[in-house]
Design a protein with these regions (language model features):
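Conserved short alpha-helical interface segments
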Residues: 1-42
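Mobile genetic element proteins and their domesticated derivatives, centered on retroelements
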Residues: 8, 74, 93, 130, ...
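Mobile-element integrase/transposase regions
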Residues: 28-84
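Active-site beta-loop-alpha junctions of metal-dependent nucleic acid enzymes
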Residues: 77-81, 97-139
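Short, acidic, Ser/Thr-enriched surface-loop or helix-capping motifs
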Residues: 89-90
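Acidic/histidine-rich, metal-coordinating catalytic segments
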Residues: 121, 129-130, 136-155, 172-173
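RNase H-like two-metal-ion nuclease catalytic core shared by retroviral integrases
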Residues: 147-163, 169-192, 199-211
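C-terminal domain-tail junction helix/linker
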Residues: 194-246
Length: 246
């Protein structure tokens, strides 16, 4: 007969209280008497995902790519918690890469509990880096940003205040809701292989990779490059501005 570990846990923990009987606590190496339900852990991890930021609240115009200015983003993760931020415009596939060097002191000192994240993509660091690279976009080309539920975007409310760009979060385990970004991350692995320290690349080198990707012709764009498609949108905005002032 086979018994799952979950059945053993349920037989030991006091039903309804999620706690061990007192005489069993001393047997635990961690001494942890309470057992937090997985759902509670998920709720804590996703506390930054509020009802108004769900992907279901994102403007419907973002779905068919007819209206430019809707972006998807994520982290490309490498060795030793290194990362590069990737942001892709849904209509033109134009890509921005975010340099995320490790903070000073990473792995060299004890990080205080609830202190700043030093891996390079803590919430405040991520917000600042994203705002720096996206705040220069024209309003018409910065309508929304869709991200997964990673805690690196916990400062999304402040990001919206600083840039005017609302952030929406995809549903759990639904990478297809950010399909453009997922596909782009796959292309980027040609330049940033898995298992490498992504902090070894400088901001200039990362920008060169973004340029290479944005000047690669795409079948989905009628063999235009993302840079050409994005520049067309910029030109349309300029022409509309001239027509309005004229």
């Amino acid at each position: 007969m086979r018994i799952s570990h979950e059945a053993i846990y349920q037989s030991l923990y006091i039903q309804g209280r999620g706690a061990l009987k007192r005489e069993l606590v001393w047997c635990l190496r961690t001494g942890r008497a309470l057992r937090a339900p997985r759902e509670r852990s998920r709720r804590k991890a996703w506390a930054h995902v509020t009802p108004e930021t769900l992907i279901s609240e994102r403007p419907a115009e973002a779905e068919d790519r007819a209206v430019p200015g809707h972006w998807e983003g994520d982290l490309l993760i490498g060795l030793e918690r290194s990362a590069i931020g990737t942001v892709v415009e849904r209509t033109t596939r134009f890509t921005l890469l975010v340099h995320l060097p490790r903070e000073e002191g990473y792995r060299h000192k004890e990080t205080p509990k609830n202190g700043p994240a030093l891996a390079g993509y803590g919430a405040v660091t991520m917000k600042n880096a994203l705002a720096n690279i996206m705040s220069s976009l024209p309003v018409q080309l910065a309508r929304s940003l869709t991200w997964d539920r990673g805690k690196e975007m916990s400062a999304h409310a402040q990001f919206k205040i600083e840039t005017g760009i609302p952030v929406f979060f995809a549903d759990p385990q639904s990478p297809w809701q950010r399909g453009t970004n997922e596909n782009t991350n796959g292309l980027l692995r040609q330049y940033f292989p898995k298992g490498t320290d992504l902090c070894r690349w400088s901001a200039e080198e990362i920008e060169a990779v973004a340029h290479a990707l944005n000047t690669r012709p795409r079948k989905t764009l009628g063999w235009k490059t993302p840079a050409e498609a994005f520049n067309e949108q910029l030109l349309l905005l300029q022409q509309a501005g001239v027509a309005t002032t004229g």
